[in-house]
Amino acid sequence: EIFINGRKMRSPSELEQLSSDNIKSVEVVHTPGARYDAEVKAVVRILTKKPQGEGFGFNNITSTNYQWEWSFNEQFDFNYRKGGFDLGGTLFGASSKGTQKKTLIQHSYLENHWKQDSYCDIKYLTRNMTAMLSANYMLNANHSFGVRYQFDRTPKADFGFPMATEVTKDDASFETSEMTSMQKRQSTGHELNLYYNGKVKDWTIDFNADGMWGYTHQNDWADESIQSIEGDEKVTVTSHSRKENSLYAAKLILSHLLAG
């Protein structure tokens, strides 16, 4: 995990916006201890200098790639700084569309030789967007506080899984099947963080409060037709789910250097 001025880094873009000239110190902790989650193996703590420059800056990144279909990404970052006040934000949008073709051949040698050939042509279309706004104020070298809010939205995540399968027994046709399944998903998420990092005499104060809430809405549909020497069968399965989640937590750490 990486912490910048006592606040946990939530996006790689936060690190990209840091200039080496603005970094006061970097501390790597290989044994984080009880103040961090048990699964955290190492912690990087970055302290920045009090901002000197003022003004507005921005960065825009556009990327595209092709894998049977075209996909696009667009990201805009901005930053405004005046005195010890720093305002930053990110707008991100992506549209991904693609195809994955797969072939699976399986042989089983039991009393008879069974062979299963499966052909799958997966298609997907996803669209998602992110908006982030953060405000930080560095009062002096010993006191800084701020707030960060992020909104994530996936209005469309559609997946199609058509698959055709043929089963043979000793090279004679035994069963054929065709299955078509679809999944449609939408999700919305919110993240809010408040932090304060300071030092009063010999005491170090580290406070963080986090809130995360959102939902996922998903529909699944599958239709399978089987033709076999033992008889034909057709099965249709549909399902709908909506999951809501929320988490709120706060942490206050007071540290004092022992004498000696």
Q: Predicted regions: what is each one?
A:
Residues 58-62, 89-91, 147-149, 207-209:
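Membrane-embedded beta-strand positions of outer-membrane beta-barrel proteins
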Residues 69-101, 112-160, 187-198:
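Transmembrane beta-barrel wall of Gram-negative outer-membrane proteins
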